[in-house]
Amino acid sequence: MLAPHQEEWTQNAERTVQVLNRLLEPVAVDIQHIGSTAIPSIHAKPIIDLVVGVRNLDDIAPYVELLKQHDIVFRGEDVAGQLLFVMGDFEKDTRTHHIHVVRWNGTEWNNYINFRDYLNRFPDKAIEYDVCKKKLAAQFADDRGSYTTGKQELIDRLLEEAHAWRSGT
């Protein structure tokens, strides 16, 4: 489930960001590599998370078919205020990328960016998160829902700290 950081994740993310920038140039304000694969000091599921910031979620609708032509498949609004696209080998049910489309500079955008930057800036916080993830991965090896739920309390606390750090308070 979890693997040590691999440099190829960063390189793959950079290539995918370039493709998305080209395809979504008129509507994407910014595209960033996020999630655990963007934090070199921690283990991660080998799925690259990217966030695409747009001014309005409706702006992405005209691009769904174009993205599909590039094997980027729309999965809907996975959580309120976010659209999810995925890449991978769907015959093998293997996802390689999760692409979250959110309102640029909105709550979701800031949460993703602040969390990544905070853990990259404070190695002790990254280690705390990594230890939690590894413990939960061992405990819930076949239950992704429980694994995700188990991390939430720590994620919420780290997000609070990240926002305070970012705002300088």
What label would you give each PLM region?
Residues 46-50, 95-97, 115:
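Short amphipathic alpha-helical segments
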Residues 1-7, 52, 115-119:
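Short histidine-centered catalytic/ligand-binding loop motif
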Residues 107-169:
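Catalytic cores of NTP-dependent nucleotidyl/adenyl transfer enzymes across multiple folds
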Residues 62-70:
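Short amphipathic alpha-helices in soluble, non-transmembrane regions
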Residues 20-61:
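Active-site nucleotide-donor binding segment shared across nucleotidyl transfer reactions
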Residues 71-106:
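Conserved catalytic core of two-metal-ion nucleotidyltransferases
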Residues 1-32, 156:
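Helical scaffold of the NTase/Pol beta-like nucleotidyltransferase catalytic core
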